[in-house]
Amino acid sequence: MQLRSSEISELIKYRISKFNAESEMQDEGIIISISDGIIKIYGLNNIMQNEMIKLPEKTFAIALNLEKEIVGAVVMGSYFHLSEGMKVYSTGRILEVPTGNNLLGRVLNALGEPLDSKGDILHDCFSPIETIAPGVIDRLSINEPLQTGYKSIDSMVPIGKGQRELIIGDRQTGKSSLAIDTIINQKDSNIKCIYVSIGQKFSTVVKTVEKLKEHDALSNTIIVCATASDSAVLQYLAPYSGCTMGEYFRDRGEDSLIVYDDLSKQAIAYRQISLLLRRPPGREAYPGDIFYLHSRLLERSARVNEIYVENFTKGKVKNKSGSLTALPIVETQGGDISSFVPTNLISITDGQIFLESNLFNSGIRPAINPGISVSRVGGSAQTEIIRKLSGNIRTSLAQYNELSSFAQFSSDLDDSTKKQLQHGEKIIEILKQKQYSPMSLSKQALLLFAVQNKYLDKIKSSEVEKYENSLLKHAEKKYSNYMEKINKSYIYDDFVIKKLKKIMDSFEFF
């Protein structure tokens, strides 16, 4: 066989023209130590803070410590298959979780993976768990109410859409119950809810899911769960994942509510991670950036304007503002609200609801201390009817508390003092409310009208609960159309006063 040089040269030219010399740059590192879920990696010179690191066997880690030559990362999941000398790779991506309407009614872990055996999630998109909070120009003032369904909160410590209201108290004082009742109260509204459970028993989470399902509120709620048996990194990430899911609705011109139950557990998990990473400990062994841990999370809760929503959706949604309201919960020890994490959260949030053990044990539920509970948004987050009817409630309770402590040392009291004490007792009784029974705006307005116009003076304190139940049944039975109008209008004028007076005057209590 004879080879021609011209054919050989043509073949070589053809092969050269078709040769593809594309290559992919990949940042590579080597594991040099493993301990308690923390890996130290040599290399990865171009890695970002909080970047995902690809490990062998489809495992990932998050880069938290960026030193000169070493990267400290925390493994998400089991780390027993890892060993020193293994190669790892940077991904160039921050951790992302699924978002969208299809998450409603589902129970997820901190990574957005389903835990409820209902199959895979058909998500709209993935979003990074760490995002920059909206700027000052993008925000609106908080002037729309978010009804909790609790008489004591809606009248004295009102919460507005986009607000951050801290719920603080010792264990077993009704913090979670208050937040869950608030979620239940949103079932007939367009407010989407996210409940983030951090460091609780899985059985407790199951009970919460069952209660929401029982009250038809689960279909409007996303449950994000990092239980006590989960790793510290999942407990640390869960609030950020839940916040990202809530931002999906906020940025598209909808209203959403998120509950963090509770952030003291997240702080403990972050302290554990930081100590394992050999970060220098500060007060109560927490790292120096513990304040930033919570501030960057809670600042993402806001009410954003129409321009922000329009720009975010690229013109698909117009003339709509969105909001993300946060109810962070923090647990205190022995009523000490001056400890490190509670004081941090008090300074970050727009108000706080203090729940006290002695009030809870004496039968006052919710066990709110009105003297030190406050909403920094104030009356601007209340409906007109509730604002005008509840104006003197806090003052009356303050006078009652002052007089009741004075009355312990005096046997003879004048008639006016006795009347004030009796009036205060009846206000406390009327503000009591059972769990899982949020109250509509019209019912709250009717009861506050009864308090303001001294209708309760005719009955004994022990009969207030019975009086309340009978009055509400009477209003529902004979004036249901009008009660429904109050729920929609929020206005308090002469016509409303006349109608409320008619309901009260037509009611006979036996």
UniProtKB/Swiss-Prot annotation:
Q: Which NCBIfam families match?
A: atpA, PRK13343.1
Function text: Produces ATP from ADP in the presence of a proton gradient across the membrane. The alpha chain is a regulatory subunit.
Its protein name is ATP synthase subunit alpha
Which residues does this entry assign to the site Required for activity?
S373
Tell me the subunit arrangement: F-type ATPases have 2 components, CF(1) - the catalytic core - and CF(0) - the membrane proton channel. CF(1) has five subunits: alpha(3), beta(3), gamma(1), delta(1), epsilon(1). CF(0) has three main subunits: a(1), b(2) and c(9-12). The alpha and beta chains form an alternating ring which encloses part of the gamma chain. CF(1) is attached to CF(0) by a central stalk formed by the gamma and epsilon chains, while a peripheral stalk is formed by the delta and b chains.
PROSITE patterns on file:
ATPASE_ALPHA_BETA
Q: Where in the cell is it found?
A: Cell membrane
Q: What is its EC number?
A: 7.1.2.2
In terms of PANTHER family, this protein maps to:
ATP SYNTHASE SUBUNIT ALPHA, MITOCHONDRIAL (PTHR48082:SF2)
Q: Which GO terms describe its molecular function?
A: ADP binding; ATP binding; proton-transporting ATP synthase activity, rotational mechanism
* Keywords from the named record: ATP synthesis, ATP-binding, Cell membrane, CF(1), Hydrogen ion transport, Ion transport, Membrane, Nucleotide-binding, Translocase, Transport
Asked whether the UniProt record includes Nucleotide-binding among its keywords, one would answer yes
Q: Encoded by which gene?
A: atpA
Residue sites binding ATP per the record: G169, D170, R171, Q172, T173, G174, K175, S176
- What are the record's GO terms for cellular component? plasma membrane; proton-transporting ATP synthase complex
Where is this protein chiefly located? membrane
Q: Which InterPro entries match?
A: ATP_synth_asu-like_sf, ATP_synth_asu_C, ATP_synth_asu_C_sf, ATP_synth_F1_a_nt-bd_dom, ATP_synth_F1_asu, ATPase_a/bsu_AS, ATPase_F1/V1/A1_a/bsu_N, ATPase_F1/V1/A1_a/bsu_N_sf
Iron-sulfur listed as a keyword: no
- Catalytic activity, reaction form: ATP + H2O + 4 H(+)(in) = ADP + phosphate + 5 H(+)(out)
In which domain of life is the source organism classified? Bacteria
Q: What is stated as this protein's family in its record? A: Belongs to the ATPase alpha/beta chains family.
Q: Which species is the source of this protein?
A: Wigglesworthia glossinidia brevipalpis
Tell me what topology the record assigns in the membrane: Peripheral membrane protein
